[in-house]
Amino acid sequence: MGKQYTVLIVDDDKFLLDMYRKKFEREGATVDVAVGSAEALVKLRGGAKPDILILDVIMPDIDGVELLETIRKEKLVPNSVVIMLTNESNQDKIEKAKSFGIKGYIVKATYIPSEVVEEVLKIANLEIK
């Protein structure tokens, strides 16, 4: 049995949220999801402190990099491992996200979902059970 951990996944795609929730839960995680940045801010400002925060970049309300900037300014999750999971491969966006202390930047199209989970856990230095 691996370490117990919490994950908050933020994406505007409900299908992907559901799929990734199931995959992380199979690895023993407690998972919460937020459909878009506004919902994520409500959860984080309400006291959610996930071990791992996974953010999409391309979202209709506030993009993931802007969301991350707000999260950092408000010091909402200073101890969470933040990982971008997106199809955005624009180098400027990647560099801006890195400037806010992300631990990883995963391009969705380059991994199958189970590999995404493995990569996230590897980045977060957590053991898969």
Region annotations inferred by a language model:
Residues 18-26:
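Charged docking surfaces used in two-component/phosphorelay signaling
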Residues 33-42, 64:
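Helix N-cap/capping motif at the beta->alpha junctions
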Residues 42, 65-78:
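Short amphipathic alpha-helix used as the core "switch/output" element in two-component signaling
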Residues 48-54:
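Active-site beta3 strand of CheY-like receiver
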Residues 56, 86:
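Active-site residues of response regulator receiver
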Residues 59:
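Receiver (REC) domain active-site loop signature in two-component systems and cognate sites
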Residues 64, 98-104:
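As written
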